[in-house]
A protein has these predicted regions:
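Short secondary-structure junction/hinge motifs that connect adjacent elements
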Residues: 33-55
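Flexible, small-/acidic-enriched active-site or ligand-binding loops
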Residues: 142, 190-219
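Internal helix-loop-helix
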Residues: 54-126, 164-171
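A short core secondary-structure module
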Residues: 159-197
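Intrinsic disorder at enzyme termini
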Residues: 1-18
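Short Gly/Pro-enriched turn/cap motifs at secondary-structure boundaries
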Residues: 120, 135-138, 162-165, 177, ...
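A structural signal for short hydrophobic beta-strand segments in well-ordered beta-sheet cores
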Residues: 145-148
């Protein structure tokens, strides 16, 4: 039973209501039956990733590149309904959409957009966002990860902590200090020197994959 204390539904248009209803139904039918066991076993229900993509829930606010181009209200409603099932489900979708796909869409080259956005939208690829570090949290000014130019490449060294989706990601958006200031890098996780270890035995967000990332002289083309 959905209780709308603030009468939000009266403010929604038909498309927004339809998407909210479809996600609510998905959570009840697919997330609710498995999420307690996933939480207890410290596992993410990876079998639900493709169905999430089939519903069009990745990169919903992006127009083109295999994304539906919906409004921000719909994205908020999607996250709200997923959160009802488990915060790990919402976290998976919001990281994929807001922290990986959107930076690539907003700041990436056309080549990078064409390479990654369709794959991320269809769940052919999973992404993670590397900002937080053990010593400084999510404060960019305290980052120790650094990148230096080497000809036409960048060499990145450092580590990241508490990274959602890190150990299952195919691509990572990594932030690092450079001589020119803080920069973001799109890194294929198969790059030599990139290591991701899953963090075990958390007290919360147990149905979410959380990882520590290590970068040992990883080479990224400009």
């Amino acid at each position: 039973m959905n209780i709308d204390l603030f009468d939000i539904n009266s403010l929604l248009n038909d498309e927004e209501k339809a998407v909210q209803d479809s996600v609510s139904r998905f959570v009840k039918e697919n997330v609710d039956p498995v999420i307690q066991e996933c939480f207890e076993n410290h596992e993410f229900p990876s079998e639900l990733i493709k169905p999430l993509a089939d519903l069009g829930l990745f990169g919903t606010s992006i127009d083109g590149y295999g994304c539906p181009g919906m409004n921000s209200i719909i994205y908020g409603l999607i996250c709200k309904e997923l959160e009802k099932g488990d915060s790990g489900m919402r976290s998976f979708v919001s990281v994929q959409s807001s922290l990986v796909m959107y930076p690539i869409y907003a700041f990436g080259s056309e080549e990078q957009k064409q390479e990654w956005l369709p794959k991320l939208a269809s769940a052919e690829a999973i992404g993670c966002f590397g900002l937080t570090e053990s010593q400084g949290g999510s404060d960019p000014s305290n980052m120790k990860t650094h990148a230096k130019k080497d000809g036409d490449d960048w060499i990145i060294n450092g580590s990241k902590m508490w990274i959602t989706n890190g150990s299952i990601a195919d691509v990572a958006v990594i932030w690092a200090h450079t001589d020119e200031g803080i920069r973001g890098f799109i890194v294929d996780t198969k790059t030599k020197g990139f290591v991701a270890n899953k963090i075990e035995n958390k007290f919360s967000l147990r149905a979410s994959i959380t990882s520590e990332l290590f970068f040992d002289n990883i080479r990224v083309s400009k």
